[in-house]
Amino acid sequence: MKLIISSSELLKGVMAVSKAIPAKSPLPILENFLFDLKGKTLEITASDTELTLKTKIEVEETVEEGRIAVPAKHMMDLLKELPDQPLTINTTNDSSFVCSWASGESNLPYFPAEDYPEITGTDDTAVAIQFPAQSLTEGISSTIYATADDEIRPAMNGIFFDIDLASTTLVASDSHKLICYTTTDVKAQEKASFILHKKPAAILKAIIGKDVEEVEVAFDSKNATFTFGQTIVICRLVVGKYPKYRDVIPQNNSNILKINRVQLLNTVRRVSVCANKASNHIKFDLQSGSLEISAQDLGFSIAAYEKVMCQYDGEPLTIGFKSPYIIEILSNMNCGEVVMKFLDSKRAALILPAEEEEDSEKICGIIMPIMIS
């Protein structure tokens, strides 16, 4: 293999796929990038077998085509220190290659491409949909924090994509809270679904640039691929059946609180300083036109409360929550005011933006209360 390429373009390419390089792997070959040069296109692959990232970049000149596996860390470290300039990569023998630039060169080892695991994507049964990039990244951002770390129920460790004839809903839950993000911009000819693990979901959110307009999503029973621009993300799907989340969404919560989101968030943060650090319990006392939030830790003889003006339409109600869950949900909503809907002190509360949402998107959160003394 021999090629000439811009050092900055090569750096962009390797950085785009580097998140798939495993920190530790039983297969040392996976600590390498796979370079595949065909014509004037260099395809760069990184994988941990569960997640694979591929990207293509144009080279300035191809002298000899080829495929080699190059050490990822050494390659990235070298490129980060080089100013933008033409870089020549040339294999000199069966085990090393030279990176040369205007004033110097570096010798690095390489490994046969045949040693790199074969990466397979989706099969002929795959369902394909077009997903607006902004909706995909917003959907992931709005739900990923609610995923679980559950060894017994691995399905809860990912985001559930529920694709319907009229809309698509992204769902995540850790049993204490549940978040749904729905968009009508994504539809399918027939109902379909898959569970995307939180790791590839986080990487997708990070690498889909603002200039990307649409992502092509294809999935079968085992794998999913996300294609945008010159980048392909291939990931193993979570195996398992996702719970019937629609059954737990409250439909008849008639006690309604409307309040400024940031004001409520900051109040919960202040009051929770005095909550018991093991339980993180806080209490909402709701009366007409007012909300009092309180917390205490009897072990340290500390307590706090704060009254907040609000709109409340319903019966007087006292209900308890774990403060971190309230903080997470409010922090991840992008709106001026929120509405919380309650039925009683023992059943789930609904949290959603108060403003009129765009017709194509909406989000809601569900949080379980805790028993209070």
Model region roles, listed by residue range:
Residues 1-373:
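Structural preference for solvent-exposed beta-strand-turn elements
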